Structure formats: structure tokens, C-alpha cells
Amino acid sequence: MASKSEKAVKKAQKLSKEPSVELTDTKSSDNVTPKQKSPNSTEEDVSLNLKTLKAKKFKLAFVLITVLSFITRFWNLNLPGEVVFDEVHFGKFASYYLQGKYFFDLHPPFAKLLLALVAKLAGYDGHYLFDNIGDNYKDNGVPYVTIRAWPALLSSLVPPVVFLIMKESGYDLLACIVSSSLVLFDNAHVTEGRLILLDATLLFSMVCAIYCYVRFFKLRHTPFSRPWWAWLFFTGFFLSCTISTKYVGFFTFLSIGLSVCLELWYLWDIKTGLTVERFFQHFLARFFCLIFFPFLFFLFWFYMHFNILTISGPGDSFMSLEFQETLSDNPITANSTILNYYDIVTIKHMGTNAFLHSHPEKYPIPYDDGRISSGGQQVTGYQFDDENNYWMILPADHYDPPIEAKLNVPVKNMDYIKLHHVGTNTDLMTHDVASPYHPTNEEFTTVSVDESAGKKHEYTLFQVVMSDNTDPQRPLYTKASSFKLIHKLTHVAMWSDPKPLPDWAFKQLEINGAKNIQTGSIFWTFDDIIGLKDSRLKKEKKIPKKLPFWKKYLELQLTMFRQNNMLTEFHPYSSNPSDWFTLHHGIAFWAKSEENKQIYLLGNPIGWWIIAGTVLSTTVVAAAEILLRQRGIRTLPETVRNHFYRSTMFFYMTYVFHYLPFFIMGRQLFLHHYLPAHLAGSLLVGAFIQLACRKSFRSPVSAGVPIPKDVDEKGHSKCHRKYGHVIELICTLLLIFVVIYCFTFFAPMTYGDKSLSVDEWTRRKWLDSWVFQYQKQN
């Protein structure tokens, strides 16, 4: 018969195999403090030894994951020694930062500023603009290995942080290893993480935000303590870093924000015993740390962006003329000339770059759709130089003598003017007749000089309203002044539709009067003065103007979102979100066909398909649990259920928030947009495997039947407790083996460092939709 001490040892060993599932009660194995024990407490000795052994296993696994992560990311970092895919863009942006030249990009500046800083510290001066994929770095004197080392460093830290997230969330060692390995040995993460790109910064910031939030959540029973404040603050800081890198970081805000809202809803419950005052202290703490301060950090990077990029550059054309006036050496402001009445000018629409144009041809009566036009002279938009683009600016009282008093008078903001078409000797007008394409917009045409001076006088008056409408007496300049032309009588604004008119208008653009005079697409510029010969030809050096930060920031934000929505054209490597789930498409990053080398962005197929299966399985389990619980059927023990919804479903919702929004986006999308969702899916896989292997489910058919003898009070099957760890171990080893094999199998296209034969490339083409680039043998 076993002694009491032997029974105690066996009991402790069994207890040690049970993972802690309650997020709040799970403590880091680094901080285990043994209880004070009596001299003969054998059970406590065994428990302490087991905890120490467990802590050592976690540390050993963490170190191994970290070392392997650095090896996979830094392996042959110097290869290829050529520009790869979007290094064309982000390397160029780093050069522009170092040159101080203004550029435009769709992404916030944080990660790009970091790349520029690393390049600066490496001694790079920004002389090379990363012009083409395949350009040799050494030939152009670029310290590319040092610059690549920064994203490689951040990418190397992602798998270890994933490991820590799982550990702090209460999962066992095997679950931690599974989740971190799916990121560690993912080919797409490695490819994106070792090049001059932004995704390494995005993913590192994302996992750090999740890790900090988990640490903060575990301290919810000790609110307002120093550690509580610290983890809350760092959660907000890393959330700010995610959205300051790419706007998809907003999805991380949503993921953590949902959890925070649910937590606040729980605290609002009167059963918690919190006073209203105490609740609002909780609310304000989260508001300032998770919204207010992150927004300040976000603004700071734009402030740095504007203060560094002070010289005119390739991004000027995306911004308003008012913005461009703040940049030194801007050709538009440098070559601008003050406008006087009776100048002959060309007038350009800022949206379509079409010149205001007219010719003797008339509008057809009727149009093809049966609507009736005025039959007047056509006024169109023409995107090329032509003498029919010439218009003379006349004062509103031009036909009232004497004219001499009106010569050499500047045209000013808010003035009423007439526009005289030089080629046909007619004046511009609009009236209450529908335009060719827009029944609600007014037709633009011209009238004779006699009519303009007589009964049509009011119809030919237009007010010049500058985009910067603060000074009503501000003079207008060519190129540098943007304005809208508002009709005095009907209050419509002249606008150019980008859709070409039919053959009767020679495929030129429609000019019409838009009733919405607040839209940003109705602005024009006086592009040039024809035949200028007076003293205005002498250009004086202009000092850049000042513009408030908020005005520059808001304009840039609107431009970024507008340009982002315009990215709808077909791209040979774009893909749909539904393709990412099964890894249906990849992206050709770089190729050297003569050597049969290439870099092809492709995830680890086995890892991606495991994540896809886990997402579907979790969806089924969660739906079944909710539906059955409504019928009074408990499928999960209460402790397991709490952990499932607090932790596993948090990872699930993080995946959902980083994946589903792409289905409603109309812009071009690429495989790398899925990487944040893949990372969240990796966390979910580890959690789900532990749940499936270590926790029992009570069968619905046994509801109402007495609990069997082999099931304890928590719903754990004795058989399940005995063999669950073994099952999980087998599943983990099998999964990791397959994932590592798959990673090494596709490694040549991850690193681009190995020439493969045609047969070897063909064997790697598991799906016909994967388009590899290599020379086929004759």
C-alpha cells in the first residue's frame, strides 16, 4: 500500500499537468513565490520543484524560439543585393526624407521615418531613389544590409512576443510553441520581415499592443496600481504605433477596443459595487491612455513629417496650391505671376487637368437620350494646348466706358468677372438648361458680345472665390492660386466631368455648372498668361508661406483617403480576400530568370490551411455552444467556458477584425494585407488545440443524465485528463514537423538565394494559380 508521501507526489504530478485557464489567476512562472512550508511538507516540495521545472521549460522554449527567429530573418540578409518589389517605394521615401523633399504616400509616416533614421545612422545621404526592381545596391552605394536589418530585427521579435502572449494568457507550453512556430516558420512573414518594407513594424507593434493589453487585463483586480497604469499606457502607445505605420492598424484598435468596451460594461454593472464616480475614473483612464495619448503620438509623426519635408518634391501635385506655397523651390509658386484684367489666360481644372475650351461647333438638338439642349456654342474641357483654350479676363463693367481706368488692375478674390473667348469673340455664360451628361447640372455655353453687354449681362457674370477665402482683397496669381468660379445668377460652380463627351464634341470633357459648390473637385487655376510682355516677367524670389499644422494635416488626411479609394485599377498580383484564406495567390517580388532564382511572396501553405481550418472550427464550436446553452445544455465546464470567451474568442475576434473589413474595400488588395489576420489566427490555433486536446465536452445527448463516475465536478473526463496531454503533444509535434518541412521546402523562393531546376520549381507549384518566374529548358 502506498505511503501518504507517495500519494502526495502522485497528486502533485496530476495537478501539474492541469493548465491554468483563468486569465486573471494565471501568473507568470517567473514570479512564482513558494508558500512558507513546514519542515515535513513533502507535497509542497514537489509542487515547488514542478513549478521550477515548468518555468525552466518555458524559458528554454522562449530562448529557442527567439534564436530561431533571428536566424530565419537574418539568414543571407545581403541577398539579393538588388531592389526587391516595394523597396522601390519605401527605399525611395527614405531617400526623400534624407533630402527633405516632399513626397506623397498612402501610409502614415512613423515606419518610414524609422527607416530613414536607420539609413541616416548608416551614413546614407539619400542620393539614390531606388528607381527600378533589380537595380544593384552596391553599384548605387546604398547600405542596404544595414537598412534591411531594422525590419529584420522587428520581425525577429514577433514570434517571441507571440509566445509571451500565449504564456500570459494562461496557455501551456505546447500551445505557446504552436502559435509562435506558425509565425516563426511562415514564409510570407519572413519575406516581408527582411526587406525594406513597413509590415515588420506593423506586426511588431500589433503583437506588442496585444501583449501589453493581456498584461493589463490580468491586473484588473488591482486597478490604478503602478503596473496597471504602465501596461495600460504601453497598450495605447503600441496601438498608436500600429495605426501610425498603416491605417489597417485601426483594426487592432477595434480588436482591443471591443474587449475594453465589454470590460467597461461589466464594471458598470451595479453588482460590481463600483460607485459612478469610480466607474468614470476607470473610463477616463482608458480614454486618455487608449485614445487621447495615442492620438497625440499619431499627430507627432505627422508633425515630424511636415518639418522634415520642406523642399518641393514629387508629392507637390497631390496637394493644394496653398499647401505647395509652404514648400521652398516650388516651381509653381516660383513661376507664378499676378493676374491683371485684360490678360489672356489659360484656365485649368485641378481635377482633370483639362483646359477650359470652346469652339464654333454647337450642342446637338436633341441629345441621344431625347433631352433638349440650347443648341449653343460648345464649352468643353480639353487636355492639350490649343488656341481655343485662350480666354480674356474682363471686369464685370467692361462694357461701361472708359476702359483705360481698368487696365493694369489686379484680379482679386471675390471679384465678379467675365471670360471672353478670344477665338470666337464670345463671352462665357451658363443658364438653366441641363448639361449633356447631368440633368441636374447646368449647361455652359457662350453668347455674343452684344448679348453679353445687353440682356444676357447677368448670365455672363462669375465670382472668383479662392480656396483660401480669408482675404477678400487678395490678388490672384497664375499657377499658385486655386479658385472656384461661381455663377452670379444661378449660384452654380463651373466643373469638369472626367467622362469624355461623344464624337459630336470630339471626345472632349464636359463642362457644366454643379449645384454643390462645397465639393473639392470644382477648383481651377489660371495656368498661364499668353503673350505677357510687361514688368511682371521679372520673377522675385518668393519666401515659403506658413500654414497651420492642423490645416496641413487635415488636407493630407483627405488626400490620402481619396487617393487610396482611387486605387481600383487592375494589378497582375492583386488578389481578393477570399483568395488569402486558402493562399490561392502569391506575389512575384523579384526574379533572376537566367539563374532561376526568385523571391515569391507565399505563406507557409500548411500553416495557412491549419489556420483556416481552426477559424472555421472555432466558429462552429462558438455557435454550437451558444445555441445549446440557450437550450440548457452545458457543453463546456464553467472555468473552461470563461477562458474560451475571454481569451480564445478574443484571438478569434482579432482575426475577424483584421480580415473581414477587406471584403468591403474597393481598392487594390494584396496578399500581405492578410498578415495581421494570419498572426491573430496563429494565436487562435494554439488556444484551440489546447482546448480540443485537454478539455472535455459533455455530449448533448447526456443532458439531464446523472454525471458519469469518470467525469469530475468540473466536467473533465478522467480518461481525457490522463491522455489529453499526450494527444496534445502528438498533435503539436506533428504540426511543427510539417510546418518546418513546408517552410524549408519553399525557402528558396523566400530568400532568393538558391537556383532551382525547372523540375524543382514545378514540384513547388502546388496550385496552378501560383505564378513562378523561371526559364524553361528547351
From Swiss-Prot:
Polar residues composition-biased segments: 29-41
Identify the main location: endoplasmic reticulum
List compositional bias (Basic and acidic residues) regions by residue number.
Answer: 1-28
Q: What is its EC number?
A: 2.4.1.109
Q: Which GO terms describe its cellular component?
A: endomembrane system; endoplasmic reticulum; endoplasmic reticulum membrane
Q: What's the superkingdom here?
A: Eukaryota
Q: Which reaction does it catalyse?
A: a di-trans,poly-cis-dolichyl beta-D-mannosyl phosphate + L-seryl-[protein] = 3-O-(alpha-D-mannosyl)-L-seryl-[protein] + a di-trans,poly-cis-dolichyl phosphate + H(+); a di-trans,poly-cis-dolichyl beta-D-mannosyl phosphate + L-threonyl-[protein] = 3-O-(alpha-D-mannosyl)-L-threonyl-[protein] + a di-trans,poly-cis-dolichyl phosphate + H(+)
Give positions of region: Disordered.
1-44
Q: Name one GO biological process term.
A: protein O-linked mannosylation
Instruction: Write down the top EC class of this protein.
Output: transferase
User: Which residues does the record list as glycosylated?
Assistant: 40, 335
Q: Which PROSITE patterns match?
A: MIR
Topology with respect to the bilayer: Multi-pass membrane protein
What is a single molecular function from GO for this protein? glycosyltransferase activity
Limits of the MIR domain: 336-396, 408-467, 474-529
Q: Which Pfam families match?
A: MIR (PF02815), PMT (PF02366), PMT_4TMC (PF16192)
Alphabetical list of InterPro entries matching this protein: GlyclTrfase_39-like, Glyco_trans_39/83, MIR_dom_sf, MIR_motif, PMT_4TMC
Q: In which pathway does it act?
A: Protein modification; protein glycosylation
Q: Where in the cell is it found?
A: Endoplasmic reticulum membrane
| Transmembrane regions | 60-80, 103-123, 145-165, 196-216, 223-243, 248-268, 288-308, 608-628, 644-664, 669-689, 726-746
Keyword entries, A-Z:
Endoplasmic reticulum, Glycoprotein, Glycosyltransferase, Membrane, Repeat, Transferase, Transmembrane, Transmembrane helix
- State the family it belongs to: Belongs to the glycosyltransferase 39 family.
Its annotated function is as follows:
Transfers mannose from Dol-P-mannose to Ser or Thr residues on proteins. Required for normal cell wall and septum formation.
Instruction: List the protein's name.
Output: Dolichyl-phosphate-mannose--protein mannosyltransferase 4
Please tell me the species this chain comes from: Schizosaccharomyces pombe (strain 972 / ATCC 24843) (Fission yeast)
Upper taxonomic lineage: Eukaryota, Fungi, Dikarya, Ascomycota, Taphrinomycotina
